[in-house]
From Swiss-Prot:
Keywords: Cytoplasm, GTP-binding, Magnesium, Metal-binding, Molybdenum cofactor biosynthesis, Nucleotide-binding, Transferase. One of its GO terms (molecular function) is GTP binding. Mg(2+) binds at D100. It comes from Geobacillus sp. (strain WCH70). This is Probable molybdenum cofactor guanylyltransferase. GO terms for cellular component: cytoplasm. GTP binds at L9, A10, G11, K21, D69, D100. HAMAP family: MobA. One of its GO terms (biological process) is Mo-molybdopterin cofactor biosynthetic process. It is found in: Cytoplasm. It holds the Pfam family NTP_transf_3. The N-terminal domain determines nucleotide recognition and specific binding, while the C-terminal domain determines the specific binding to the target protein. Gene3D superfamilies: Spore Coat Polysaccharide Biosynthesis Protein SpsA, Chain A.
């Protein structure tokens, strides 16, 4: 069993962005490729979790494993993606990144990965007082609790945290520059990063 697998969450509707964010380009690379490269520094196996309508497009652009959410929980957000990968692979830990944080650094991912240990169920960034649940590492023992939440249609990440032992990593212990957490949700935000 591999100790850790990577997950790129790329299944959102991108309504505010107007087109699938995963395929926006920054510095000549698709957003999802930046996330894959960041994870590649700490994991061997990487899964891209996406919407069924985008699966073929991803498969044309990458050799990574591309999957869609378990159909029972499709449309329930990041928790559904994390659950699906936990069911798909045997890794003990799942390192999660969203596809829309083009400033996330491989060095930051490597630093966060060092916090994974058996005392915790999840390692989550709490950067400058803001919890960043989509930049985190989840132990597979959280899978049953995630499934319970999904069955109850409670797809809030914070609901999971109430039921598990979370280690919050702050900026002094992770990464001082807040820009690594800058995500892109709108065309204006995209214009800001490319100009």
């Amino acid at each position: 069993m591999n100790k850790m697998a990577g997950v790129v969450l790329a299944g959102g509707q991108s309504r505010r962005f107007g087109s699938p964010k995963a395929f926006a380009k920054f510095n000549g690379k698709y957003f999802f490729e930046i996330a894959v490269e960041t994870l590649r520094t700490v994991v061997e196996d990487i899964y891209i979790v996406s919407h069924p309508s985008l699966i073929d497009c991803f498969r044309q652009k990458t050799a990574e494993k591309v999957i869609m959410d378990d159909e029972r929980y499709r449309g329930q957000g990041p928790l559904a993606g994390i659950y699906t990968v936990m069911k798909e692979c045997e890794a003990e830990w799942i390192f999660v990144l969203p596809c829309d944080m083009p400033y996330m650094r491989p060095e930051a991912a490597a630093k966060l990965a060092k916090y994974a240990n058996e005392k915790f169920d999840a390692i989550i960034c709490a950067h400058f007082g803001r919890i960043q649940p989509l930049v985190g590492i989840y132990h597979r023992r959280t899978c049953k609790q995630i499934e319970k939440l999904l069955q109850a249609q409670d797809n809030r990440m914070k609901s999971l945290f109430r039921h598990c032992h979370v280690h919050y990593v702050n900026e002094q212990d992770f990464w001082e520059d807040e820009i690594v957490f800058r995500n892109v949700n709108t065309p204006n935000e995209f214009d800001d990063i490319v100009t």
